[in-house]
Amino acid sequence: MMRIPDSISAMVYTMRHPHMWTLMVWAIAAIGYWLMCSASEDYVPLAFVSMACIGFVGAMPLIKSDDNTLHWVCGIGGCVLSQVWCVVTAMAKPLPTVGLLVTAWAVYGVVMVCARGRKWCFWLEVWCMAMVVMVAMA
């Protein structure tokens, strides 16, 4: 039976071929960058740095480190920058996009309350990527 990992990055340790993790995350970063650039050309540097952080997250498990400081810094940076991009892009779009953004974060809060805070990092990573896709498609 599959368990939900503590974070998306923890999945690398359950894979048969860990190098596939890096390729998968780089593909996600490339698709995320493409979505972000196609939605708004005004914030391309923000999109690039955000997805570059995510790309580094993909490569970090291959570098053996006990404290994973760079991994955490890149992960947090990628999540924060992607959400900044969501907010500034949503502000330039019609008002329903802003309402959708606020509603989605409220739903995330409800999920965390129902899950009693378990696996918060995993759900936050999934939610940030879902927010990027949702705002890019709006």
Give the label of every model feature segment.
Residues L46-L101:
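Membrane-proximal helix-loop-helix units in multi-pass membrane proteins
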